[in-house]
């Protein structure tokens, strides 16, 4: 199996909603959080859905390549579910922007968060030392992440990620009838780390239009081999993908950056 490490950098404010919680207090719509640590994340199902939508509507990706990566569900004439060849993991928050007196904002993290990500990569067979991750984040931070001052205490990072510190934005009625709800967002420039796992190639069976006879309802098929790394890299590396809610008001536009592939 091949594996690739990706950074996801929010270019606009991001709201990937948590539908499994009921609102208490001011916040009506909360963001997704890691069920163990409470640190913001993007669940793998939400990430896969957003990437699939981008591959379908925006990317110049063949139908057979999309089938190889994402699979397909039953419906719309498809009789059975076909499993995709790519495994998607949760995107973990690695860098959070906070206000700064000198540079408007700076990016912060904590050692525990980075250690946890390095540990996951190691368990999945990717040797990626802590120092290499830090250097990659410095590059991704474009001058706003200082490895000497940006790695803060875990308790302080948790406080920055808490409901009390993350932005909450009022969504107003277009008819001027007042606020409809209050939703939590992650500020733009937040950086996540994720992992994709896939075989070198996947064979998919598709309809062969050149040999099918629609009059006699005779459907011929053909098998196509898809180079997974080539298809994934071409579709997503250095591309901007919309993730989460509120696309029509500019939320959730994120850059995908491939960091390493093994």
Which ranges hold each PLM region?
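RNA-binding basic/glycine-rich loop and surface signature characteristic of RAMP-family CRISPR effectors
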Residues: 1-262
